[in-house]
Structures are given as C-alpha cells and as structure tokens.
A protein has these predicted regions:
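Active-site machinery of serine-nucleophile hydrolases
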Residues: 161-230, 599
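Gly/Ser-rich "nucleophile elbow"/oxyanion-hole loop immediately N-terminal to the catalytic nucleophile
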Residues: 155-162, 211-244, 254-260, 304
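Short beta-strand immediately N-terminal to the catalytic nucleophile in serine-hydrolase-like folds
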Residues: 239-241, 264-266, 313
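Solvent-exposed alpha-helical segments and adjacent loops
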Residues: 429-673
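Amphipathic, heptad-repeat alpha-helical segments
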Residues: 22-80
Length: 673
C-alpha cells in the first residue's frame, strides 16, 4: 500500500486527525477552463445562429420519429447530428475563437439541413461519396454523437466491394479544436498522407487528450464504425500521426501493436518522466502516480512492436525528437532496431524527402499486409487493460504494475512453446480458418518448461486453449474458475478505467453524513459533469440514486456520489466493500479519518454485478491538468484514496490526498508490510 501520511499513522485515533477549527473549503482547485472561452459574438449573429441551429435540431427530432421503425435509416442519423452538435456546442460553450468561424457555422448548418432533407426522403448519398466525407457515430461510453473524417479514394465508386487498406491519421495538439473547427478541417483538407486506393480515417479523439482515455476509445469506435460502412481490409490498417498525434501513435501503436500493419509516429512524446523533465525539475509526483505511468508510457510497451512494422520520423532539430530517441533505446533493449527517418535541418514538421521515404516504406509494408497468425508473438504489459497481442492473451497477472511478458512460438504443426513472466492466466486463441496447427490430435504446449496437452483444434480451423499458473506450475483448463473476486481484463482499475466503458453518474438525493460532505459532493459532482462535457465532449449519463434500474446495473459502471446516508445505492453495497464508513469515521485498511472531513474514492467490482465497476466520488482524475502538456494527462489516483474535503480538491495535489493505494489481485487491501 502506498500511503501519503498527511493525517495518520496506524493505530492513531481518528479524533486526532481532524482539526475542527480549520475553515471548511469544500472546493475544486481553480485551473484554466479547457477549452478556453472564445470571443464574444455579436448579439444579432448569435441569435440568428441559435435560431438556425434549433431549427436543425427540430428536423433531427422529426427524423428520429419518422424512422423509429426503420433502423437502417435511423443508424445514419448521427451523420446529421454531428453538424448540429458542432454549432450547438460552440454556442453553448462559447468556443468561437475567430470571426470567420461564424461563416463556418453557417456552412455546417447548411450541410446538416441538406443531409436531414435527404434522410427524410430515405436517401443517404454521403455514404457513397468519395473524397472528403464527414461521418458520425453514437459512442457506447455515454450515448454521445462523435464525428470523424474520411478520405475515400475515387476507386470506391467504381469498385465498391473490394477491401482496401485504411490508414488512421491522428491530429496534433490544438486546445481550440472544437467540433466546429474539426469538421471544417475535414471538409477542406485531406491531411498529410493520402496513399492511392487507401481510405484515410481522421478521428476527432474527443478533443485534446493525446488519444488516451475516452480519446483512445474514440479511435477504436470510429474505426469499428468505418468498418461497417466501407470495404476495409482488416489486415492492412495502419496508424500514423504527428506531434500530439505522434504521441497517440506511439501509445496506440505499442498497446495494440498486433492490430496494425504499420505504425508511423512523427514527433510527439512516448512517456512522461523524461519528456516533462520531472527529475531535473525536482517535481516528482507521488509514488502511486509514478506507478501509473505504466498504463500509457509507450516505452514500457516497446517490446510489443515486435508484432508490427514501425517507421518513426523526427525533424533533426525538433525538440520532440526525444520521443523517437527514447523509444529507440527501449527497442534496442528488446533486441529491435528502430527505423528512424530524420528530416535534415528540420524543426517541428515533415521534411519533403523524409516524408516521401516514410510513405514508400509504409506503402511497401501495407502492400504485403499483416499476418493475423504469425509464427511468433510477444506481449509486454503492466495491466490487464492491455492484455492481448495477436493470438496471445493474458487474463491474469501475478502482480499488476510490474512488467509481464509472454513469448509464444509455433515450433511445428503440433507444438507451441511459451515463456512467461508475471502471468497467472493465459489464453492462446486463433480465429476460424487461420490455425496452422495440425487439425487432428491435441497440440503439445510447453509453458515455462511445463509440457501440457492443449485443447484440440476445431473443425473450422479455430483454436482456443486456456492455462492457469498455480504455485509456479502450469496446467491446462477448460475454463477459468474464480473463487471470489479477482482482477481480470476490464476489471483491474485504476479509477480512470471506469470511464473507458459505459458509465452512469449516480446523484445522491438524501442528506449527507455532514454539512461539509453535502457541499463537497455537490461541488465535485458538478465539476466532474462539467469536466467530462468540456474535455471529453459529451454530456455524461446521469440519474438520481432512487432511479437506478436493473438494466443500469447490468450495463453500466456506476459512479456513485455521496455517502451511505445520502446515496441509497451506496447504502446497498457498502457492506460488501473493503471500506468502513460510519457517522464518525471512514476507514480503508490502515487509513482512518473523520467522515465529517474526509471522503473515500475508490474503484471496485460492483457487488450488484461483479462484471461492472462501481466508483465512489470521482470523475476522471487528470481534469485539473487539461490545460497543460498532454504528457501530464495520466491517471492521478490509483484504486482508492481518502481525500481531505477541507482543501480545494485536485487529484494531482498530494496535499489533499490523505492516503491512497492499490488493491491486490484479489481486490483486497494488501497486508501491512
């Protein structure tokens, strides 16, 4: 357990922890709004734009009613809604940043009205258009409509069924990149690279987060949606980007390496510690936050690039060359030699000759395609959130946030050899038609020297074999059995993990245990709702505690605000949480504090549905860092924390965190050392 002993030591009486004479300040730490407030629009122009925007909204409502019984047409409604949202939210959030964006807003409303009129007639011509196309989808996270852009090659119009290569392009940092500006760019610019006969996908990434957290999910959801709409060859999907997009490319490239035919980052950053110069600045965060760099640091996942082709780019005199340099060091340690293209005497941009070389190399790799079942797969991870490469999947770790490794090789048509470290549950899985193992008999699987009989190959030429490591010995099993709770993929924490799947904010309706808790909860909930709307471009799903249904419990991570007295859902589960919470004290393991002045935050499997999370009293944790470098946008809290309500809350400020730590692999508080 990692404790910040601001208030207590083991055995210290809780009454000694709180200082009753200290003034209550249940406030959120003040930081610049992200995105910033834009220019003031002329009153008449704003009123006219609002009227036209509302008219499009009414047309969309009418379309929803009209096509309620025709799902194929209703599925195209987001293609209209993205235009309405772009202008509506620019007005609502006051994020017009220059006068010319008034004209842009008008143009987007015209396009939205045109699509609405076409959809009313049962027509969707934009779905067959070539060139620059804007599409929309509904996110599973929060039911929000999110835009993405496409470059559709002319060949699609004459040969629409042939599967094609798709390149994902991740945009650079722009803390003024509203939906309005993004869609305008996607109407007017094809981007840096447009290879022939290739679909190019431009994700919005939910604003400016380096394609992490919900931004990561936006890339994956946009890709999944595009695959349902266009002839995409799943073995020829590459990921590319520059600057912040280069950082996103390093992240998504290493964490999902086996999914890409090529990874081509330019500039950006690949980790937080060296890029931010924290050691040099003597600005190291708490130990638990440093541990959580193991979630997104691409350097810690460099070994996964064994599973794909990588072409990196840097300008010779670009400070962000640091990203490729540090990745090169880590790849060398993995036995891999990074191909690093340098733009001579070039700063933060592509050099023309280097750009041409990158294109040639990526084109050559993409032409060959990705091997979906390679003879050898390597996996490196520190968390079950990122647990798969190719046909290798890790379903259990011995210890989270320490390196776990798998090296798996097909050594013959009836033998697989695997070496692991820090792995407790392993799955080897190959899809239909692709298993190269001999179809009759059982393959031999050797794991860390233990020779085992694997499951038989199925007649559709698929294969799945499960293995468990118990007390240092591996054995084959038919299915994983869990006696009680265990960390598993998608249920492993930290707190931020709850916000990359569908979640529901649950408001308290009763009085809290203390007046301070009432005020603090209201402030934190309000800030969390605002932060998600502004920084992740969606209104969170919200319900009162007494309105929660069985369907909500089945489908959503529940973000519970308040305490057992104010929130009836917390009261339902409190006895099954590793938490003591009374009128006088709140306790997590060794950490004890007065409930009048302290609140718990935690993530835990929902006792009402252990396939989903509950979270207590927290939104995403980096919100106070949204205006800073994207490299600071990392998780600020682990699995649990006790927070001092008397201080302005900022998850990244250790002075307001009384104690914090991780649950073990059984979702238990570790024993004292």
């Amino acid at each position: 357990v990692l404790l910040r002993r601001k208030i207590l030591a083991l055995g210290l009486a809780a009454a000694a922890l709180g200082q009753a004479n200290e003034p209550a300040k249940p406030l959120v730490a003040t930081t610049p709004r992200v995105p910033a407030v834009g220019i003031e629009l002329p009153g008449d122009a704003r009123a006219q734009l609002r009227e036209r925007t509302d008219a499009l909204g009414q047309a969309i409502d009418a379309l929803a009613r009209q096509h309620v019984d025709t799902p194929p047409l209703l599925h195209h409604l987001p293609d209209v809604q993205v235009y309405h949202k772009a202008v509506d939210w620019a007005l609502k959030h006051r994020i017009f940043f220059k006068p010319s964006e008034l004209k842009t807003a008008g143009e987007l409303l015209v396009e939205g009205r045109e699509r609405a009129a076409q959809l009313a007639k049962g027509k969707t011509p934009w779905t067959r258009a070539t060139g620059l196309v804007v599409r929309g989808y509904v996110s599973r996270l929060d039911d929000s409509v999110q835009p993405y852009g496409l470059v559709i090659p002319p060949s699609v119009s004459t040969d629409p069924w042939r599967k094609r290569r798709l390149d994902i392009w991740l945009h650079g940092r722009d803390d003024k990149l509203s939906e309005l500006k993004f869609i305008q760019q996607r109407h007017t610019s094809a981007g840096q690279f447009t290879p022939p006969d290739t679909i190019v996908l431009h994700p919005y990434g939910r604003f400016c987060n380096a394609f992490k957290f919900a931004g990561e999910m936006d890339v994956l959801e946009a890709l999944a949606h595009a695959k349902t709409q266009y002839p995409v060859d799943g073995n020829r999907v590459s990921i590319r980007g520059f600057s912040m997009g280069g950082a996103g490319c390093w992240h998504l490239g290493t964490h999902f390496a086996g999914d890409w035919v090529a990874v081509a980052p330019g500039a950006g950053f690949a980790e937080s510690l060296e890029y931010l110069g924290l050691t040099r600045k003597n600005a190291m965060p708490p130990a638990y936050e440093q541990t959580l760099w193991g979630l997104y640091d691409a350097t810690k996942y460099a070994g996964n690039l064994f599973n794909t082709a990588t072409v990196a780019y840097s300008g010779e005199i670009d400070k962000q060359r640091q990203a490729a340099n540090i990745m090169e060091r880590h790849l060398t340690a993995e036995g891999l030699a990074l191909h690093h293209v340098i733009g001579p005497d070039t700063g933060h941009k592509y050099h023309p000759a280097a750009k041409a070389e990158i294109d040639d190399r990526v084109n050559a790799v993409a032409a060959k395609g990705r091997n979906p079942v390679p003879a050898e797969v390597r996996l490196v991870t520190q968390t079950l959130r990122y647990n798969r490469q190719g046909w290798v999947q890790v379903d259990g770790l011995e210890t989270h946030w320490k390196p776990a490794r798998v090296k798996a090789r097909l050594t013959s048509e009836k033998r697989v050899e695997v070496a692991t470290d820090n792995v407790s549950r392993l799955v080897l899985s190959m899809p239909s038609g692709l298993c190269p193992l001999r179809p009759n008999g059982n393959p031999t699987v050797v794991i860390d020297g233990d020779e085992l009989t694997g499951a038989r190959i199925r007649t559709d030429r698929s294969w799945e074999a499960l293995f468990v490591n118990a007390l240092g010995r591996w054995r084959a099993v038919g299915r994983f059995k869990f006696a009680g709770l265990a960390k598993r993929p998608g249920l492993q924490g930290p707190i931020d993990d709850a916000f990359i799947n569908r979640f529901l904010m649950v408001r308290p309706t009763g009085p809290a245990l203390s007046p301070m808790a009432d005020k603090w909860t209201a402030a934190q909930l309000g800030q969390a709702l605002s932060d998600w709307e502004l920084q992740f471009r969606a209104k969170p799903l919200v319900k009162d505690d007494n309105d929660i249904t069985d369907a909500d419990i089945a489908d959503c991570n529940l973000i519970l605000w308040g305490d057992p007295q104010s929130n009836s859902t917390i009261a339902r589960v409190i006895d099954q949480l590793p938490l003591g919470w009374s009128e006088t004290t709140v306790q997590l393991g060794q950490a004890v504090a007065e409930s009048a002045t302290h609140a718990p935050m935690l993530i835990y499997p929902n006792p009402l549905n252990p396939k989903r999370y509950i979270v207590l009293n927290s939104g995403f944790t980096f919100s106070r860092f949204g205006h800073m470098s994207n490299a600071t946008q990392t998780p600020k809290l682990p699995d649990w924390a006790l927070v001092d309500m008397r201080r302005p809350y900022n998850a990244g400020d250790p002075t307001c965190i009384a104690a914090a730590g991780f649950f073990n692999e059984r979702w238990q508080l570790p024993m004292p050392e």
